[in-house]
Design a protein with these regions (language model features):
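Surface-exposed cleft-lining segments at the edges of enzyme active sites
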Residues: 15-24, 61
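Aromatic-rich peripheral "rim/lid" segments of glycoside hydrolase catalytic domains that contact
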Residues: 2, 26-86, 91-136
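Short, conserved beta-strand edge motifs with alternating hydrophobic and charged residues
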Residues: 12-16, 45-48
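Active-site cradle of extracellular carbohydrate-active enzymes
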Residues: 2-8, 14
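His-enriched metal-coordination microenvironments in redox/metal-binding proteins
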Residues: 8, 17-20, 90
Length: 136
């Protein structure tokens, strides 16, 4: 990698993770990319994690399950070559998510892109984060 070859002090790469709930993640490609970054001695950080569910149909519980699955797919792919040491979500509660102000759902329901709902109660998304950070 040119920067490392030039002696630039590069220690980590943050993967901005604004996901679309209706789109599956290329877990194989992501795992290979992360493994390559780590082979250069770089730490891989998950940053700006949220999941836009505006195109999903179903109950909030059904949407939450799909959102959690996308997060689990992301973190599983990243963890194939080493532990996930840092996860930064782009907000903590659905109540204050930028997604609700930018991408309104056609059914007028609020988006549910973050680990805590609008009442600050944990959702399955939070369980996935806990699964990957319990030993961090």
């Amino acid at each position: 990698m040119d920067l490392l070859d030039q002696g630039v002090p590069l220690h980590a790469v943050g993967l901005q993770s604004h996901l679309q709930a209706e789109l599956e993640i290329d877990t194989h490609g992501l795992a290979e990319f992360v493994a390559e970054l780590r082979s250069w001695g770089l730490e891989v950080l998950v940053t700006e994690l949220d999941v836009d569910d505006q195109k999903l149909t179903g109950t909030p519980a059904e949407r939450d399950a799909i959102v959690a699955k996308r997060v689990d797919d992301l973190l599983t792919a990243i963890s194939t070559s080493g532990p996930v040491r840092s996860i930064l979500t782009w907000g903590i509660s659905d109540r204050y998510s930028w997604i609700n102000g930018t991408f309104a759902r056609k059914d007028k329901q609020p988006n549910r892109p973050l680990p805590l709902d609008g009442e600050f109660k944990p959702k399955p998304f939070m369980d996935v984060i806990s699964k990957f950070t319990k030993d961090a």
